[in-house]
Amino acid sequence: MPAYKRVLLKLSGEALMGDDAFGINRATIEGMVNDIAEIVKLGVQVAVVIGGGNIFRGVAGGAAGMDRATADYMGMLATMMNALALQDAMRHASIEGRVQSALRMDQVVEPYIRPRAIRQLEEGKVVIFAAGTGNPFFTTDTAAALRGSEIGAEIVLKATKVDGVYTADPKKDPSATRYTTISFDEAISRNLQVMDATAFALCRDQKLPIKVFSIVKPGALKRVILGEDEGTLVHV
């Protein structure tokens, strides 16, 4: 029995690379889509916000001397490429994915329209939100917090390459332990970088919990949906 009826899944662009140094690894994206298909079959309504860091990172571009707003718009276009790849992989897995973009690109995808997104979720379609918030200076984590709040998601599932939030970097500190649950305030006081500050504050204000888990760990997404001990739950 699923623990959640409607979720917002945040996928980082980097997660789509698999073991590659750049771009989209087809086997990796197919594995993610198969995981999503499993929870859709359980009757869970799934919306996805996807990053673009495997193609272009606005923050990195800005740091290299590029105008930050221009770099961020380029990053938004990178998320569009990822969203279309995800939608295509879903089609091959017999899931109906619908891409809605915060930037208008009418020949390619639908614009973001909240009531339409909610209706599509209720119809069992997976809605993929592309182009972040549509505004520069906001990350795709913030887009996940925003869209999750707008569609009435019960939780934001932050899919990463690490299986939760740790007391320290587990790659550097072998004694680091994983938090099973932690409050927003505790995460802030311990300076744990769960999401960027804007996204984190929005989730906290909206009382929207965050689950951090590993998307590369087989079966982890399904275990999260079933309410099993997987990843770290950040709560009010």
From Swiss-Prot:
Pfam families the record matches: AA_kinase
GO terms under cellular component: cytosol
Activity regulation: Inhibited by UTP.
Keywords from the UniProt entry: ATP-binding, Cytoplasm, Kinase, Nucleotide-binding, Pyrimidine biosynthesis, Transferase
Keyword Membrane listed: no
Positions annotated to bind UMP: 52, 72, 133-140
GO biological process assignments: 'de novo' CTP biosynthetic process; UDP biosynthetic process
SUPFAM superfamilies from the UniProt entry: Carbamate kinase-like (SSF53633)
Subcellular location: Cytoplasm
Binding site for ATP: 10-13, 53, 57, 160, 166, 169
Primary location: cytoplasm
Top-level lineage group: Bacteria
GO molecular function: ATP binding; UMP kinase activity
Reaction(s) catalysed by this chain's protein: UMP + ATP = UDP + ADP
Matches recorded under NCBIfam families: pyrH_bact (TIGR02075)
HAMAP family named among the record's database cross-references: PyrH_B (MF_01220_B)
Cited function: Catalyzes the reversible phosphorylation of UMP to UDP.
PANTHER family membership: URIDYLATE KINASE, URIDYLATE KINASE PUMPKIN, CHLOROPLASTIC
Protein name: Uridylate kinase
Source organism (scientific name): Cupriavidus metallidurans (strain ATCC 43123 / DSM 2839 / NBRC 102507 / CH34) (Ralstonia metallidurans)
Protein's gene: pyrH
